[in-house]
Regions:
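Active-site nucleotide/adenylate-binding loops and adjacent lid/helix of ATP-dependent enzymes
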Residues: 1-74, 86-88, 116-119
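ATP-dependent carboxylate activation and anion-phosphoryl transfer catalytic cores
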Residues: 114-207
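Gly/Ser/Thr-rich helix-start
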Residues: 43, 48, 76, 157-159, ...
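A short, flexible beta-alpha/helix-coil linker loop
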Residues: 41-43, 101-104, 154-157
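Predominant activation on well-ordered alpha-helical scaffold segments within soluble catalytic domains
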Residues: 2, 6, 58, 81, ...
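Phosphate-binding site of ATP-dependent enzymes
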Residues: 49-130, 140-141, 145-147
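Broad gene-expression machinery/nucleic-acid interaction feature
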Residues: 32-34, 77-79, 134-136
Length: 207
């Protein structure tokens, strides 16, 4: 995905499967520490390490196979729940939230917001990539510039936030399954400033 994003002119975190290519780019100033070292095929932020020097990168690669190196983006992480109509193949809903707290790769606390610049970027990206149906996009706002981080072709763990804010993608799916085309509601179908917070619950019952 990194190669496709870079080729099509989208800002994204520099990514390397070859550590020697990464070290070479460090030498010429194309990337600097810290960086993330993580499994190329991973999930839930498992086995992700933040490396501050070459020795740490070498150590991590020596102890585990299938790793990649990714540029550290120091900015606000954003989640976007997007629905592309499966009849018209047009984007009909985008819900965006600022991630305020993360746990095990999932959003623990977030607040909804809207930005036309971000909506325009998502629409352009989705059309060029050719996605369809429900997708979940991770984005970073770094000094006012949006970087696309990753895309998952499914509902994200924080989708209940979108649903409770008004972005009912379940209804959109039902309409499409019935052969009905959905109307575009980008920027119109949810409220700004809605917070979502997850919590753990414990119940003790005495016999």
């Amino acid at each position: 995905m990194y190669n496709w994003l870079a080729k099509n002119g989208y800002k994204c975190a520099k990514s390397y499967m070859d550590k020697d290519a990464f070290f070479a780019d460090v030498e010429v100033g194309l990337i600097s520490y810290p960086v993330f070292v993580k499994p190329a095929r991973g999930s839930a932020s498992i086995s992700i390490s933040k490396a501050y020097d070459k020795e740490t990168v070498e150590l991590l690669f020596a102890h585990e196979d299938g790793l990649m190196i990714q540029e550290f983006l120091n900015g606000q992480e954003i989640g976007a729940d997007v629905y592309i109509d499966m009849v018209s193949h047009e984007i009909v809903s985008i819900f965006t939230k600022k991630k305020l707290k993360m746990r095990a790769g999932e959003t623990d606390k977030a607040v909804s917001f809207k930005d036309k610049k971000l909506f325009d970027l998502i629409e352009d990206f989705v059309k060029k990539a050719g996605y369809n149906g429900q997708i979940d996009i991770d984005i970073f706002d770094v000094n006012g510039e949006y970087y696309i981080s990753e895309v998952n072709p499914r509902f994200g763990g924080g989708y209940p936030h979108a649903y409770e804010s008004g972005a009912n993608h379940m209804c959109l799916i039902v309409n499409n399954l019935a052969g009905r085309e959905n109307e575009c509601a980008v920027g119109k179908n949810y409220k700004v400033g809605t917070y979502m917070m997850k919590y753990n619950e414990i119940m003790i019952q005495h016999s």
